[in-house]
């Protein structure tokens, strides 16, 4: 379950992670002011677009279907989308699952050439006999590091990009 830090509750948008402080000196007086670090690019439709600087994981993984219901105890296919956060990344994806559930294959390899590239991997998930509930979570191992985050982008004209 997602839990937001108490300091962020009630804020209209998430504060920028990176800021820079400038100090203007006029004679003997110094005036400091702080600005967010932003990224500016040109969009053919929207014109100049300003976005906050983002520090993202090297790779993210998500399960597109947020709720899965297994009507029987037969195996069903579960898709995992792996997204590169940098160029030339490879590794293995596995599914963390509840006790008694079975996932095949246990892990799958992936290779992504470009930042932003995605690849869909399919796992067969078999629930235990009888009723059970739990969470499936994709775990990515790459270059000796473990990643378990999903990238969710909020991008609407009437809501600030987050």
Residue locations for each model-derived region?
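Surface-exposed, proline-enriched loop/turn segments that connect beta strands in immunoglobulin-like
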Residues: 64-66, 105-108
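Beta-strand-rich binding/interaction modules
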Residues: 1, 18-25, 77-83, 87-101, ...
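Short beta-strand elements
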Residues: 29-62, 146-162
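Short, surface-exposed loop/turn segments at beta-strand-coil junctions that are enriched for proline
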Residues: 1-14, 27, 111-115, 126-132
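Short, solvent-exposed loop/linker segments at the N-terminal edge
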Residues: 67-74
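Well-ordered beta-strand positions in beta-sheet-rich domains
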Residues: 30-34, 92, 107-109, 120-122, ...
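Membrane-proximal interfacial segments on either side of biological membranes
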Residues: 7-34, 38-45
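Helix-enriched interaction subdomains in cytosolic or periplasmic regions
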Residues: 120-162
């Amino acid at each position: 379950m997602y839990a937001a830090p108490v300091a962020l509750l009630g804020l209209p948008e998430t504060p920028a992670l990176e800021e820079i402080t400038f100090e203007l000196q006029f004679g003997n007086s110094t005036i400091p002011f702080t600005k967010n670090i932003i990224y500016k690019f040109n969009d053919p439709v929207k014109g100049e677009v300003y976005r906050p600087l983002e520090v993202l994981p090297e790779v993210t993984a998500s399960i597109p279907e947020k709720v899965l219901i297994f009507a029987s105890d037969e195996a069903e296919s579960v898709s995992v989308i792996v997204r590169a956060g940098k160029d030339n990344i490879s590794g293995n994806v596995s599914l963390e699952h509840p006790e008694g559930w079975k996932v095949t294959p246990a892990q799958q390899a992936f290779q992504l050439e470009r930042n932003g590239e995605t690849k869909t991997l399919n796992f067969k998930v078999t629930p235990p006999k009888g009723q059970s509930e739990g969470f499936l979570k994709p775990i990515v191992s790459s270059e000796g590091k473990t990643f378990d985050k999903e990238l969710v982008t909020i991008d609407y004209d009437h809501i600030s990009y987050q």
